UniProtKB/Swiss-Prot annotation:
PTM field: Glycosylated.
One Pfam family from the record: PA
Lineage: Eukaryota, Viridiplantae, Streptophyta, Embryophyta, Tracheophyta
Protein name: Signal peptide peptidase-like 5
Entry keyword annotation includes Plastid: no
Enzymatic class: hydrolase
Stored CDD domains: PA_GO-like
GO cellular component terms attached to this protein's record: cytoplasmic side of endoplasmic reticulum membrane; endosome membrane; Golgi-associated vesicle membrane; lumenal side of endoplasmic reticulum membrane; lysosomal membrane
Residues carrying a glycan: N79, N145
Chain ranges for the short sequence motif PAL as given in the UniProt record: 489-491
Originating organism: Oryza sativa subsp. japonica
Transmembrane feature ranges: 193-213, 246-266, 276-296, 317-337, 343-363, 368-388, 427-447, 460-480, 487-507
């Protein structure tokens, strides 16, 4: 069990890695690249659909240039045009033959992008596709001192593999035509709606389980307290609840350790390191899934859940746990082996949700002070590693790690994700574990307080904290779409909503001190009530 708990905390440290993000930006507003007359386009991704000998073939993705006309966004407005190899192949000098409205396929060469485009346009080409010399895509920019940039044909850069695939087809004597367009993303994709429901539902389930466990522990404690002083001492000195309360120091240390962990991921990000993260995620996912299933099934198989068997290194384990564990292990292993398959995201989300629910049930925020410190630190952590880190690393560290840009993976596994079903660019909508888990700890605290104070849904704090969390996450997705899909730190919006709701409500109701310092309502201990001397009956007067 100690190993499982360690795995859970390892995942907890990794959970604050990524904010909500879309499947990839298609529009890049670059303020660093020079903007001069005739060279001021935004950098956009471009679909290049090919036909070989009249039959539809592969589709490639490139990036549009800073100069020239913008690529059309509608497929129906994009012309299907013949593709030809340039001669010379780099188009750094004027082509030997005139072309009549065709698109030229050229190699990167050593001359400027604008020079290639000018020679291609002068030869009568209607466009130019440049093959990059590396796998990545570069931004085709202009130099500050360039003039006479009246270029009227579009230019697109393809990565090396895609460009040479077209080059091979052309050199084999085939007839190739292409269609170039850059479709817009939908304003709202159903993936974002389902991801919002998934995140809110996870916090809801985890909060009720945490509050239910706390209520059962409290009822058991009050029952034992009534049995006498000796039992009271045993209860006070024992720690059989299995819950872990966070304090202020551990809340601060969590963010420090998470920052170190994030830097390590950024610096060491590679295929083998992602494999290690997958193993850690599977260990935590197995523990989470097993805990959730045992808790759910124990209501129907009570005898199996209350009968225990000694297992080496693990101690006493219930028969129900032994029965469920193989299924959980097989499920996690199958996901790890087949995680690149189209529907593997379902397995990842199931393991992730189970892990988050388990952590919220085990780890508790004891009062509003600790919750405020934890979420405030996470708030600045998110902002720093999404926005401020660009100044030192020239890229957003958190987004690079979350997307797995330096690996062949789709990103680190510590994410919930859903494919963007109606997005022509595909990709995933994602949310980091920390954006669910950390606010979820505060929401669970609110429900535990409500139940301990015997508050109704309307007069308590849980309903409003859930509304605040859902609203903050909703605003995150609004900001995400307004920023053209650029990754957003979700805690930037969620923390002010959730903390603000609890603090303002507590202050208005005059309960802020109890929430802040004690974390529980005033109540009289039943044992002390039992031990208080009873008032004497006055003697009867004759």
């Amino acid at each position: 069990m100690a190993a499982a708990t360690a795995a859970v905390f390892a995942l907890l440290m990794a959970s604050a890695l990524a904010g909500a993000a879309a499947g990839g930006d298609i529009v890049h507003h670059d303020d660093e690249a020079p903007k001069i007359p005739g060279c001021s386009n935004d950098f956009i991704l471009v679909k290049v659909q090919s036909w070989v000998n009249g039959k539809e073939d592969d589709e490639y993705v490139g990036v549009g240039a800073r100069f020239g006309p913008q690529i059309v966004s509608k497929e129906k407005h994009a012309n299907r045009t013949r593709l030809m190899l340039a001669d010379p192949i780099d188009c750094c000098t004027s082509p030997k033959e005139k072309v009549s409205g065709d698109i030229l396929l050229v190699q990167r060469g050593k001359c400027k992008f604008t020079k290639k485009a000018k020679f291609a346009e002068a030869a009568g080409a209607s466009g130019i596709i440049i093959i990059n010399h590396v796998h990545e895509l570069y931004k085709m920019v202009c130099e500050k001192n360039e003039t006479d940039l009246d270029i009227n044909i579009p230019a697109v850069l393809l990565p090396r593999d895609a460009g040479f695939a077209l080059h091979t087809v052309l050199t084999s004597g085939n007839s190739v035509s292409v269609q170039q367009y850059s479709p817009d993303r939908p304003v709202v994709d159903t993936a974002e709606v389902f991801l919002w429901l998934m995140a809110v539902g996870t916090v809801l389930c985890a909060s009720y389980w945490s509050a239910w466990s706390a209520r059962e522990a409290l009822c058991e404690q009050e029952k034992l307290l009534k049995d006498g002083r000796e039992v009271l001492l045993n209860v006070e000195n024992g720690s059989s609840s299995g819950m872990i309360d966070i304090n202020v120091a551990s809340a601060i240390m969590f963010v420090v350790v998470a920052s170190c962990f994030l830097i390590m991921l950024y610096k060491m990000m590679s295929s083998w390191f992602v494999e290690l993260l997958v193993v850690i995620f599977c260990v935590g996912g197995v523990e989470g899934l097993q805990t959730c299933l045992v808790a759910l099934l124990s209501r129907w198989f009570r005898a199996a859940s209350e009968s225990f068997f000694k297992v080496p290194f693990f101690g006493a384990v219930s028969y129900l746990t032994l029965a469920v564990s193989p299924f959980c292990i097989v499920f996690a292993v199958l996901w790890a082996v087949h995680r690149h398959f189209t529907y593997a995201w379902i397995g990842q989300d199931i393991l992730g949700i189970a892990l988050i629910i388990t952590v919220i049930q085990i780890v508790r925020v004891p009062n509003l002070k600790v919750g405020s410190v934890l979420l405030s630190c996470a708030f600045f952590y998110d902002i720093f590693w999404v926005f401020v880190s660009k100044r030192w690393f020239h890229e957003s560290v958190m987004i690079v790690v979350a997307r797995g840009d330096k690996t062949d993976e789709d990103g680190v596994p510590m994410l919930l994700k859903i494919p963007r079903m109606f997005d022509p660019w595909g990709g995933y909508s994602i949310i980091g574990f920390g954006d669910i888990l950390l606010p979820g700890l505060l929401v669970a605290f609110a429900l535990r307080y409500d139940w301990a104070a015997k508050k109704s849904l309307q007069t308590g704090y849980f309903l409003w904290s859930m509304v605040a969390y859902g609203s903050g996450l909703l605003i995150t997705y609004v900001a995400l779409n307004l920023m053209d899909g650029h990754g957003q730190p979700a805690l930037l919006y969620i923390v002010p909503f959730t903390l603000g709701a609890l603090i303002s409500l507590g202050w208005k109701r005059g309960e802020l001190w109890n929430l802040w310092s004690k974390g529980e309502p005033e109540r009289v201990c039943p044992h002390h009530m039992h031990m208080q001397p009873q008032p004497k009956t006055p003697p009867l007067v004759q």
